Amino acid sequence: MIAKIIMCVSLFIQSSIEIDRATTYNAEVTQCNSDPLTTADGSRIDLDKLANSQLRWCALSRDLIWDEERQKLHNYDTSVFRGFFRFGDTIVVESISSPQINGKWVVRDCMNKRYKRSIDFLFDPKNNKPKLGVCPDVRIINK
């Protein structure tokens, strides 16, 4: 509990969190798991809303997400699920080089455990998703 309070205070002191790796993904088996339309928090992806840009959902690396239930599953490993954000939180993203990702996104998913300080933006595979590569200037704004 004390660690969570310290992290929250730290976030409020910071004006933003710099992201090391920002990418895009699609709800496909090759990029997710065997049920790509269900996110880590149990939300179902509505492909029609996604196609019409009505869904702005993202996945964060496990070091940025706070989830007590998942901490138990990982034997309270301090490197996972002890971050600043919870599933369902709305975050504000800013990027100078990729303005199409600027704005509000809802945290609904988490990334593979090999990623740290990373964000993955969900886009419709039929639409032209932005080609981010590894975007160097993405940050989550504390507003």
PLM regions with names:
Residues 1-8:
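Sec-dependent signal peptide recognition
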